[in-house]
Amino acid sequence: MQHNRYLKWFAVAATVGMLLILLGGALVTKTDSGLGCGRNWPDCNGSLIPKEITPEVLIEFSHRLVTGVVSISILVLTVWTWRKLGHIREVKLLGFLAMFFLIAQALIGAAQVLWGQGDFILALHFGISLISFAAVLLLSMIVFEVDRKFDADNVFIGKKLRWHTIAVTIYSYLVVYTGALVRHTDSSLICPDWPFCYNETPLASPNNMYEWVQMGHRLAVLIIFIWIAYITWHAVKEYKNQRVVYYGWIIAFTIVFLQVIAGMLVVLTKLNLTVALMHSLLISLLFGLLCYMIMLVARSNYNEKMK
């Protein structure tokens, strides 16, 4: 029992650590601190520990340090869960995904520092980190036996909800990419108004690539908001007796609603840093929850085959 308690605490620490990596990367982008350590990696401006500390150096170096520490903790968590919970079907795959995509995002970050990358490649950085976070989050939920508390092992999801769950999760990744592209192309404030680029001329076409990027992201968000609202309505109507599905989609709709509000406030507050980081946090939580719903779909399929 004592070992299980330690594993739970460690899983929480690893999950929080992955969130810090995500938010740290967003902070690096939003403060334009990506070259705070110059074109040097893994050292910072020619030394292991930076000698001259500026805000940009502090942000970039801290992000690298957190990534290194969390990478080790996730490796430990992966091995630990493999040994203790390897009998649970998803554990080994989730551990592999967590490590693989964490290494991938670190390599993309290093490549950006050493050689520079295009905006469309850089936009993948956040999304790749997000997959690693989702894997660690699901591992933690398994460690805490969330499934047993909500009787998720016996869940049954109909074909309609299965299709919508898989499709909206894949689509959410596209939404994440468009949001990251907004950041990396410096298009966050290209449109001064909300919900249209210019509220005085709401039907006007975008004038340049940056407005297309910004308005394309807003359109993508509108679609996912309506989509998740519909799925939530369906889940509330048809799955009242399956708490994990019922409450899962209610939480998903709450998060996507808050995400839309945060996106609006990013524009209205002229890219306030706290609001912008909250925007990144909410999409991370939403994607993690959608991935959990995917795991429930997989379990439902397995339960159906075993009958």
Curated annotation (Swiss-Prot):
<feature type="transmembrane region" description="Helical">
    <location>
        <begin position="248"/>
        <end position="268"/>
    </location>
</feature>
<feature type="topological domain" description="Extracellular">
    <location>
        <begin position="30"/>
        <end position="56"/>
    </location>
</feature>
<feature type="transmembrane region" description="Helical">
    <location>
        <begin position="57"/>
        <end position="77"/>
    </location>
</feature>
<dbReference type="InterPro" id="IPR050450">
    <property type="entry name" value="COX15/CtaA_HemeA_synthase"/>
</dbReference>
<feature type="transmembrane region" description="Helical">
    <location>
        <begin position="219"/>
        <end position="239"/>
    </location>
</feature>
<dbReference type="GO" id="GO:0005886">
    <property type="term" value="C:plasma membrane"/>
</dbReference>
<feature type="topological domain" description="Extracellular">
    <location>
        <begin position="114"/>
        <end position="123"/>
    </location>
</feature>
<keyword id="KW-0472">Membrane</keyword>
<dbReference type="Pfam" id="PF02628">
    <property type="entry name" value="COX15-CtaA"/>
</dbReference>
<keyword id="KW-0350">Heme biosynthesis</keyword>
<feature type="binding site" description="axial binding residue">
    <location>
        <position position="217"/>
    </location>
    <ligand>
        <name>heme b</name>
    </ligand>
</feature>
<dbReference type="GO" id="GO:0046872">
    <property type="term" value="F:metal ion binding"/>
</dbReference>
<comment type="function">
    <text>Catalyzes the conversion of heme O to heme A by two successive hydroxylations of the methyl group at C8. The first hydroxylation forms heme I, the second hydroxylation results in an unstable dihydroxymethyl group, which spontaneously dehydrates, resulting in the formyl group of heme A.</text>
</comment>
<dbReference type="GO" id="GO:0006784">
    <property type="term" value="P:heme A biosynthetic process"/>
</dbReference>
<feature type="transmembrane region" description="Helical">
    <location>
        <begin position="124"/>
        <end position="144"/>
    </location>
</feature>
<feature type="binding site" description="axial binding residue">
    <location>
        <position position="63"/>
    </location>
    <ligand>
        <name>heme o</name>
    </ligand>
</feature>
<feature type="topological domain" description="Cytoplasmic">
    <location>
        <begin position="298"/>
        <end position="307"/>
    </location>
</feature>
<feature type="disulfide bond">
    <location>
        <begin position="191"/>
        <end position="197"/>
    </location>
</feature>
<feature type="topological domain" description="Extracellular">
    <location>
        <begin position="183"/>
        <end position="218"/>
    </location>
</feature>
<comment type="pathway">
    <text>Porphyrin-containing compound metabolism; heme A biosynthesis; heme A from heme O: step 1/1.</text>
</comment>
<dbReference type="GO" id="GO:0016653">
    <property type="term" value="F:oxidoreductase activity, acting on NAD(P)H, heme protein as acceptor"/>
</dbReference>
<keyword id="KW-0479">Metal-binding</keyword>
<feature type="topological domain" description="Cytoplasmic">
    <location>
        <begin position="78"/>
        <end position="92"/>
    </location>
</feature>
<feature type="topological domain" description="Cytoplasmic">
    <location>
        <begin position="1"/>
        <end position="8"/>
    </location>
</feature>
<feature type="topological domain" description="Cytoplasmic">
    <location>
        <begin position="145"/>
        <end position="161"/>
    </location>
</feature>
<feature type="transmembrane region" description="Helical">
    <location>
        <begin position="162"/>
        <end position="182"/>
    </location>
</feature>
<feature type="disulfide bond" description="Essential for catalytic activity">
    <location>
        <begin position="37"/>
        <end position="44"/>
    </location>
</feature>
<keyword id="KW-1015">Disulfide bond</keyword>
<keyword id="KW-0560">Oxidoreductase</keyword>
<feature type="binding site" description="axial binding residue">
    <location>
        <position position="279"/>
    </location>
    <ligand>
        <name>heme b</name>
    </ligand>
</feature>
<keyword id="KW-0408">Iron</keyword>
<keyword id="KW-1133">Transmembrane helix</keyword>
<feature type="transmembrane region" description="Helical">
    <location>
        <begin position="277"/>
        <end position="297"/>
    </location>
</feature>
<feature type="topological domain" description="Extracellular">
    <location>
        <begin position="269"/>
        <end position="276"/>
    </location>
</feature>
<feature type="transmembrane region" description="Helical">
    <location>
        <begin position="9"/>
        <end position="29"/>
    </location>
</feature>
<feature type="binding site" description="axial binding residue">
    <location>
        <position position="125"/>
    </location>
    <ligand>
        <name>heme o</name>
    </ligand>
</feature>
<feature type="active site">
    <location>
        <position position="60"/>
    </location>
</feature>
<comment type="subunit">
    <text>Interacts with CtaB.</text>
</comment>
<feature type="topological domain" description="Cytoplasmic">
    <location>
        <begin position="240"/>
        <end position="247"/>
    </location>
</feature>
<protein>
    <recommendedName>
        <fullName>Heme A synthase</fullName>
        <ecNumber>1.17.99.9</ecNumber>
    </recommendedName>
</protein>
<comment type="similarity">
    <text>Belongs to the COX15/CtaA family. Type 1 subfamily.</text>
</comment>
<keyword id="KW-1003">Cell membrane</keyword>
